[in-house]
Amino acid sequence: MTAQEDLTAGGAELWRQISGKFLVQPHSCGTAAAVFLGLTHVMSEDPEAMVVVYPPDYFIYPGARFAKNLNDATKIARELEQWVVLLGVHAERLETEHGWIQPGATLGWTDGSHLRRIEALLNRSDVKSRRTALASGCVCNTSILAASAASLWAAARDNFPEMLHLFQDYQASIGSDNQQATLRAAYEKMPVLSLSTDILQSILDQVMVMELSHVVWSDWRNPEWVVDGLRVIGRRTALPQRIC
């Protein structure tokens, strides 16, 4: 999933080599629209499907341990059909590029990972609240989640019908000659919404946080973060010294 303005010639060639369905948004309209474009195709093919959502630019190590965490989250979301399992990770410093999760009451444990209700989802721009949350044991919002496709669809239907109606119109056009034209028309009217602070916030009593355990999580959107992530796992970097 990407937006048209982010798609380079090299990137397009890379995605063509990867199996699966590669979707391009006409333009960026926030994280909710990006997720729901993919979700629309899932709902068309299998309305009872389980879905996992995660950004493509994260480094998580070791991969096998993360896969186990993600598998556990998916099992929980399958058993508790109306619940969304959002993954959080303990932060060692005051992050400014990510949102935060204020955990609430304990719901249980799974293989060493704490499952808790969520008291609040904090926007990354809310610095004062972030400082308070960090001191009180908040976790960084990875934006990685497991849920049934139907539960996310219902959240938008009940709380953001304008957005969902646009995707329903697009859903009806999938496979037809006017599919791309319908998508472009939908995005001309698409509201800019956040998956976390809009969609998930609207169903917060159905969202739990599962704290990632025994993994290193790092955002690799810039070279400095790549270097930091490699250093944590004891790997040398070939990046220029001026970046390191």
Feature-to-residue mapping (PLM):
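Conserved core of the sugar-phosphate nucleotidyltransferase
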Residues: 63-185, 207
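Conserved N-terminal catalytic core of the sugar/cofactor nucleotidyltransferase
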Residues: 1-53, 58-67, 71, 89
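Left-handed beta-helix
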Residues: 147-244
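Structural motif
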Residues: 21, 50-52, 83-86, 143-144, ...
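A polyampholytic, Gly/Pro-enriched intrinsically disordered region
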Residues: 41-52, 106-112, 231-234
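A conserved hydrophobic position in a structured secondary element of the catalytic/binding core
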Residues: 2, 54, 122-125, 147, ...
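A short acidic, often aromatic-flanked loop/helix-cap motif at beta-alpha or helix-coil junctions
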Residues: 28-33, 93-95, 126-128, 215-217
